[in-house]
C-alpha cells in the first residue's frame, strides 16, 4: 500500500505557524470579535435534585480539586484511574517523565486493561437489562433499544467476524458508516480484540476516504449500503467502491444493509455484515491491552492542509473522556445522554460512545438532522426518551433559534438537567436562547472548549460551581493548566488580557502524536516550545473567565467541522481553469463561519469564467462541485470571487487576514509593509464589491 506522507511542518506550507508576525496579525482579526462580549452578564448556578447531587459542590471544592490536580497530577489521576476504570493489571507508574509531545509521553505505565471490558462487560454483568443504546433513525418511527447484555453479545459477534478475516491486535480497521448501532458494535469490537479503528465521517467524498484508508494502513473496511439524513439518501457503498478501486491491498469490505438500497457486491471482497454476525458466537475473549496501546486514529484538518491521523491511547483517553463527562455534566446512574454529534468526529467518539458507556449510562445515537421532519425534532426526542442531558453544536442551536420558539415549547423538556454546546464558541444570543427557551432557565449550560487532539473537554463550567457568562467557556477542567501567551514574545500574560491559548504540561487524554508522521508534533510545539499550541485565541476577563476568540492559524470552523484552508485551496486549483486560490472564513449567523474563496484564473482574459457579473454562474457551480467531490459537502464555498492577484508576503505566503478584512468590509488593513504586492488590494476590493452587486 502506498505511503502518502504528509509534508513536513518545516516546509513552506507550514511556515506561517512558526512566524509570530502572522500570529499577531491573526490575533488582530479575532480580537475584533471580543469587543461586544458580555463580560458582566452572569447567571447563577442552578439547583439540582436531591438524588442527583453536584459532583463538585461549590467553587471552594473546585479550587481544592483543581489545585490538587495541578500540584500533584500523579496522585490526582492515579486515584481517578483506580476509581473509574477496571484494570486487568494495575499500573506501576502514573506518568512518564515526559510532559509534552516532544518527550515520550505516557500515562499509567505497565497497566493492562480493555476498553470494551470497561464500556460493556462490567455493565453487562451488573445491569444487563439497562438500556445502553437508544437509536433513533432519520425516520422518527425507527427506534431501537439495545440493552447492555445485547450490546455485549453483538460486540462479541462483530469481534469474531473481524477475527475471521484475520484482523488482530494492532491492525487498522476503516469504518465508513451511518449513525447506526452497528457502527458502535464495530468500534467496540475493534477495542475488544486490540485492533485500531479509524472512523471516517460518512459525508466525506471518495478521495478523502481513500487518503485516510491509505494513511492509516487499514486492512479492512466496514460500511453500509446507504445512510439517510433529512430524507436525503447517501450512497455509502458507492463511495467505498470508488475509493477501493485505487487500494487493491484492501481485500475485504463488510457491508451492512441499513436501508436495503440497491448495491453491487464485488465477489470475493464484499460480505454481508448481518449474515456474518448471525453465524458467529456471542462471546469473544478480551485482549489484554497496554495503557499506551493505540485505541483509534481520527483524522482532522489542520494548518498543514494534509489531514492528520490523531492517535489516542487506551487508558488515558478513556479515563479522561469518562471523568470529564461525569463531572462536567453531573452524570448519575440512570441518566440518558443525548449527544447530537456525529461518530465521524471526536465529539461522537468521546461523548456519544466511550464516555457514556464507560460511565454505565444510556446514550442516544441519532441518524437524522435537527430540522426533519420539522424543527422540533431534538425536543421531540427529549420528550420521547426522557433525555436528561443534551449536547449539540452552536450551529444547530442558532438554526433552531431562528425558526422560532414554538417548535421547542410544544414538547415536554422537564427531564433535562444539563444542556451542552460543542464544536465552536457559542455566541451570547444563542446561549441565552438555549438557557431561557430550551432550558426554561433551570438547566445548567455547559459551554465546552476542546479539540480532537485533547481527547476530551479542557475548558468548561462545572455545574454547581460557578456563575456562568453567555459565550464564556469559563474555567479549566482538572489537570488542565492554560497559559495565555503574547504572540510576539511567547511570554505568559498574567491577569486580564488576550493572546494565544496554550496548555502547560500533559493530561491523560492528550493525543500521542500523528500516526505515520510523528514529526508533525512540531505543529503543536514549535510555535511555543514546551507548550501545547491550540491554534486559538483567548481572552481572560477581570473575573478570570476564559473566552475563546477564534482560530489564529489557517483552520476554518464551519458548522463545528474543522477544515483546512490549504485543503480547500488545493481542491479549487485542481480545476483546469484555476491558477491560484485562497480560502478564508467570515462570520455567519447560523454556521459560525462562511467560506469565502478568492480565485485567480489561468486565463485572466477569458470572460467565460467571469463569476462576478452573473448569478448564478455555471463555472461557479463547477468549482463548488470540485470542493464537494474532493472534500465533502461541509466544505462547499459560500462565495467564490475571481481576482487578478492574491496578496502575498515576499516569501510567497498568502496574507489571508487582508482577504478576511476585505470580505468583512473592514478598511483598516493595519501594517501592510510585509505585503509584496499591495497594489492588488484595490483590485480585490473592486471585485468583491462587484460580486456583492450581482
From Swiss-Prot:
Q: Which UniProt keywords apply?
A: ATP-binding, Ligase, Nucleotide-binding
Catalytic activity reads: acetate + ATP + CoA = acetyl-CoA + AMP + diphosphate
Q: Which domain of life is it from?
A: Eukaryota
ATP-binding recorded as keyword: yes
Give binding positions for CoA.
229-232, 347, 559, 628
| Binding, ATP | 423-425, 447-452, 536, 551, 562
Read off the SUPFAM superfamilies from this record. Answer: Acetyl-CoA synthetase-like
Where do Polar residues bias regions lie?
Answer: 9-23
EC number, UniProt record: 6.2.1.1
This entry's Gene Ontology molecular function terms read: acetate-CoA ligase activity; AMP binding; ATP binding
Biological process per Gene Ontology, one example term? acetyl-CoA biosynthetic process from acetate
**What's this protein's name?**
Acetyl-coenzyme A synthetase
Its taxonomic placement starts with:
Eukaryota, Sar, Alveolata, Apicomplexa, Conoidasida
Q: Tell me the name of the encoding gene.
A: ACS
Amino acid at each position: 500500500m502506498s505511503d502518502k506522507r504528509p509534508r513536513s511542518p518545516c516546509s513552506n506550507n507550514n511556515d506561517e505557524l512558526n512566524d509570530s508576525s502572522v500570529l499577531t496579525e491573526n490575533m488582530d482579526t479575532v480580537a475584533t470579535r471580543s469587543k461586544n462580549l458580555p463580560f458582566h452578564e452572569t447567571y447563577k448556578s442552578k439547583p439540582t435534585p436531591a438524588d442527583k447531587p453536584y459532583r463538585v459542590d461549590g467553587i471552594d471544592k473546585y479550587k481544592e480539586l483543581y489545585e490538587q490536580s495541578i500540584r500533584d497530577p500523579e496522585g490526582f489521576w492515579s486515584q481517578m484511574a483506580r476509581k473509574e476504570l477496571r484494570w486487568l493489571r494495575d499500573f506501576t507508574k502514573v506518568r512518564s517523565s515526559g510532559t509534552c509531545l516532544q518527550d515520550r509521553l505516557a500515562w499509567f505505565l505497565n497497566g493492562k486493561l480493555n476498553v470494551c471490558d470497561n464500556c460493556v462487560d462490567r455493565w453487562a454483568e451488573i445491569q444487563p437489562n439497562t438500556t445502553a443504546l437508544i437509536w433513533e433513525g432519520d425516520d422518527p418511527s425507527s427506534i431501537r433499544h439495545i440493552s447492555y447484555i445485547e450490546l455485549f453479545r453483538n460486540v462479541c459477534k462483530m469481534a469474531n467476524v473481524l477475527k475471521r478475516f484475520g484482523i488482530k491486535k494492532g491492525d487498522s480497521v476503516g469504518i465508513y458508516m451511518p449513525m447506526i448501532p452497528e457502527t458502535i458494535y464495530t468500534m467496540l469490537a475493534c477495542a475488544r480484540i486490540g485492533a485500531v479503528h479509524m472512523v471516517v465521517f460518512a459525508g466525506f467524498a471518495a478521495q478523502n476516504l481513500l487518503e485516510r484508508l491509505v494513511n492509516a494502513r487499514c486492512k479492512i473496511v466496514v460500511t453500509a449500503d446507504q445512510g439517510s439524513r433529512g430524507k436525503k439518501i447517501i450512497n455509502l457503498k458507492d463511495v467505498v467502491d470508488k475509493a477501493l478501486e485505487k487500494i487493491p491491498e484492501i481485500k475485504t469490505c463488510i457491508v451492512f444493509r441499513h436501508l436495503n438500497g440497491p448495491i453491487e457486491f464485488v465477489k470475493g471482497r464484499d460480505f454481508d455484515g448481518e449474515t456474518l454476525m448471525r453465524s458467529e458466537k456471542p462471546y469473544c475473549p478480551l485482549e489484554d491491552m497496554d495503557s499506551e496501546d493505540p485505541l483509534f486514529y481520527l483524522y482532522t484538518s489542520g494548518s498543514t492542509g494534509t489531514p492528520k491521523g490523531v492517535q489516542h491511547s487506551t487508558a488515558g483517553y478513556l479515563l479522561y473522556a469518562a471523568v470529564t463527562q461525569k463531572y462536567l455534566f453531573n452524570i448519575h446512574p440512570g441518566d440518558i445522554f443525548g449527544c447530537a454529534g456525529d461518530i465521524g468526529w471526536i465529539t461522537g467518539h468521546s461523548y456519544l460512545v466511550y464516555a457514556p458507556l464507560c460511565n454505565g449510562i444510556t446514550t442516544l445515537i441519532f441518524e437524522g438532522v435537527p430540522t426533519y421532519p420539522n424543527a422540533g425534532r431534538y425536543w421531540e426526542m427529549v420528550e420521547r426518551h426522557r433525555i436528561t442531558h443534551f449536547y449539540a453544536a452552536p450551529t444547530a442551536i442558532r438554526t433552531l433559534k431562528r425558526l422560532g420558539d414554538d417548535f421547542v415549547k410544544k414538547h415536554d423538556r422537564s427531564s433535562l438537567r444539563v444542556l451542552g454546546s460543542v464544536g465552536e464558541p457559542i455566541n451570547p444570543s444563542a446561549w441565552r436562547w438555549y438557557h431561557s427557551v430550551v432550558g426554561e432557565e433551570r438547566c445548567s449550560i455547559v459551554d465546552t472548549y476542546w479539540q480532537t487532539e485533547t481527547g476530551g473537554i479542557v475548558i468548561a463550567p462545572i455545574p454547581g460551581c460557578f456563575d456562568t457568562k453567555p459565550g464564556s467557556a469559563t474555567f479549566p477542567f482538572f489537570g488542565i493548566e492554560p497559559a495565555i501567551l503574547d504572540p510576539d514574545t511567547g511570554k505568559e500574560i498574567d491577569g486580564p488580557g488576550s493572546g494565544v491559548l496554550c496548555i502547560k504540561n500533559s493530561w491523560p487524554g492528550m493525543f500521542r502524536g500523528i500516526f505515520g508522521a510523528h514529526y508533525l508534533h512540531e505543529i503543536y510545539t514549535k510555535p511555543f516550545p514546551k507548550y501545547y499550541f491550540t491554534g486559538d485565541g483567548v481572552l481572560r476577563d477581570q473575573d478570570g473567565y476564559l473566552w475563546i476568540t477564534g482560530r489564529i492559524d489557517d483552520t476554518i470552523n464551519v458548522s463545528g467541522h474543522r477544515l483546512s484552508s490549504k485543503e480547500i485551496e488545493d481542491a479549487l486549483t485542481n480545476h483546469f481553469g484555476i491558477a491560484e486560490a485562497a480560502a478564508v472564513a467570515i462570520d455567519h449567523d447560523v454556521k459560525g463561519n462562511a467560506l469565502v474563496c478568492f480565485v485567480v484564473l489561468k486565463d485572466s482574459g477569458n470572460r467565460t469564467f467571469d463569476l462576478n457579473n452573473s448569478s448564478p454562474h455555471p463555472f461557479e457551480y463547477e468549482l463548488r462541485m470540485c470542493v464537494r467531490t474532493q472534500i465533502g459537502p461541509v466544505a462547499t464555498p459560500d462565495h467564490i470571487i475571481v481576482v487578478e492577484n492574491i496578496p502575498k508576503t515576499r516569501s510567497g505566503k498568502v496574507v489571508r487576514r487582508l482577504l478576511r478584512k476585505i470580505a468583512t468590509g473592514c478598511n483598516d488593513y493595519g501594517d501592510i509593509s510585509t505585503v509584496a504586492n499591495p497594489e492588488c488590494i484595490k483590485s480585490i476590493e473592486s471585485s468583491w464589491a462587484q460580486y456583492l452587486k450581482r
